[in-house]
């Protein structure tokens, strides 16, 4: 089977798998595997992350609202300062029947990268994200995410690996160590305008003592990127949860635009 058709078959298979997998709950405000590239110096990227939980948790757990039929809208604004540094800011919101539109919290995300002029064999950058979320949306109100980013474009093929580590700074799990949350993306350029691939998002528990499989979170997103122009970013996908601790079915879309300021 030719590589492009093998990948297309895998995307379709993963999408169909959603009809037979169990459900549960976790936060889903920005669903994205990061690439190495930074926003260019003196430019600003504005993104809207829209995520709708088609089938999620249906009861309040530890004071946190259920995710079923929740629409999460996140605004991300990132400015490039140099060829090795950018900084992003997030505004998280949630919309649910009967509760209206709620502000969830804000995060700030500085990121550094190996400059392209060094010509390393892979892209390498490091993101650190710190922020607050209201108790009704998370049992941990202040958190820190440390995300190394490694990626590579080889012809039409692309892969990215984000071995992410999360830490509570205030809340229910503040005494717990770093939680390992790996994210992975494989994609293929079917045409100059259309890229298809698979995105994986996981959270397996403390880095030194993984949780039992049933308590871990694992999501698989068949996803499409539309390469409309260098200024636009368009990504959408349908995610399937494959453990009882993961929301069963989520639709996501990212729409971004690069401004020359």
Kindly label every feature range from the protein language model:
Residues 25-261:
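Transmembrane beta-barrel domains of Gram-negative outer membranes and organellar outer membranes
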Residues 19-25:
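Sec/Tat signal peptide C-region and signal peptidase I cleavage site
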Residues 1-10:
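Bacterial N-terminal signal peptides that target proteins for export
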């Amino acid at each position: 089977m030719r590589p492009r058709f093998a990948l297309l078959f895998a995307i379709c298979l993963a999408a169909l798998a959603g009809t037979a997998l169990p459900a549960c709950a976790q936060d889903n405000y920005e669903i994205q595997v990061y690439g190495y590239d930074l926003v260019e110096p003196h430019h600003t990227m504005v993104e809207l992350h829209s995520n709708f939980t088609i089938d999620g948790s249906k009861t309040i757990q530890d004071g946190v609202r259920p995710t079923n039929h929740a629409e999460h809208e996140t605004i991300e604004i990132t400015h490039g300062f140099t060829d090795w540094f950018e900084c992003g800011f997030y505004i998280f919101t949630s919309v649910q029947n009967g509760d209206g539109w709620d502000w969830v919290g804000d995060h700030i995300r500085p990121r550094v990268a190996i400059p392209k002029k060094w010509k390393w064999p892979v892209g390498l950058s490091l993101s650190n994200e710190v922020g607050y979320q209201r108790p009704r949306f998370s049992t941990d109100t202040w958190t820190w995410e440390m995300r190394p980013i490694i990626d590579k474009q080889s012809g039409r093929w692309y892969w990215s690996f984000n071995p992410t580590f999360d830490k509570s700074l205030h809340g229910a799990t503040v005494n717990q160590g770093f939680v390992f949350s790996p994210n992975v993306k494989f994609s293929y350029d079917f045409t100059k305008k259309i890229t298809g691939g698979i995105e994986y998002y996981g959270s397996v528990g403390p880095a030194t003592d993984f949780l039992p499989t049933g308590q871990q979170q694992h999501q698989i997103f068949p996803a499409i990127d539309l390469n409309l122009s260098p200024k636009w970013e368009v990504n959408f996908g349908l995610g399937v949860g494959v453990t009882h601790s993961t929301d069963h079915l989520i639709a996501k879309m990212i729409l971004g635009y690069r401004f020359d300021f």
